[in-house]
Amino acid sequence: MKIILILCLSITLISQGHFDSLDLSLANVSDAEIKSLSETLYKLDSNRATASELLIDPQTLIPSSQTGSGNDLSPQPLFKVVSSTLLSKPTYEAFLDLLDNYKKMTGEVEDVPSHEEQEQDSFLQQTMNTNLGKELFNFLHSKGVYGSQSEFLQDLKMMWFGLYSRSDGVKLDSSGFEHIFVGEIKGGKVSGFHSWVQFYQCEKQGILNYYSHSFDGPWTTYPDVLGMQFNWDGYFKELGSAFIGCSPEFDLAIYSLCYITRPGKKCDVSLGGHSLGIQTYTWDKSSYGDGKKFIGSAYPITP
């Protein structure tokens, strides 16, 4: 009788998407392996910015107790120099093509015409063309998470670009990519927005005003991590953390690694010998495939 009950429970869990081969595979990914792979991805980021390609001016550092003050304490933009050569690299160009595909207000339905879907495919493929992207796939493949690169790419596409409703539960107005890398406005405030490339683009367009920072990581080369306060097109962000100077493929890879192996949890990584926590969130109100969850958010944890 006990065996029958266990079998029935297992079948129920499988049908609800709570128990599948992916869960079993991820049980074999240790914290030490995540830290080791994150160091490898860090070293393989050949498209990261160099000191001559990127120069920032963080200016005013404030205590975490003052992040909500909304005061502009930095008269100059955050980004002083960004090399056009850096931004013309294939993964950067593919990433930049995606940034104007979204409506910032939640509640406004996102349309995805065929050319925008092609841009999604292009960015993912450009990422897989890098040694960094290949290393991430090879690791997950070795753990039995994905059987082929095409399966991996298809899952990344749904995970990051699949649409869901962040407003009324009906309007498909958001995606993980939009929230994390482009940013959204919800409840009169900036939500998401964890990409330095998007930050720079908006500063250059004159629609983003950098206020201050409350955290500056220990790294002396790029990528670094900043926790920032800023105003985006009239809306305030109390604390927006982001990698600064990493390539777009590194952003995608490190967040994907943490989301796939530690979904909805704090994920401990190691970059250049320094420890860092990355927080991911699952979007639990809708799913794709066999009960898989879209990525809701991901960002570096800053005090």
UniProtKB/Swiss-Prot annotation:
It is found in: Secreted. Its EC number is 4.6.1.-. Residues 30-303 form the EndoU domain. GO terms for cellular component: extracellular region. Its cofactor is Mn(2+). The active site is at H179, H194, K237. Its main location: secreted. Disulfide bonds: none annotated. Endoribonuclease that cleaves single-stranded RNAs at 5' of uridylates and releases a product with a 2',3'-cyclic phosphate at the 3'-end. The UU and GU sites are more efficiently cleaved than CU and AU sites. Belongs to the ENDOU family. This is Uridylate-specific endoribonuclease A. It comes from Danio rerio (Zebrafish).
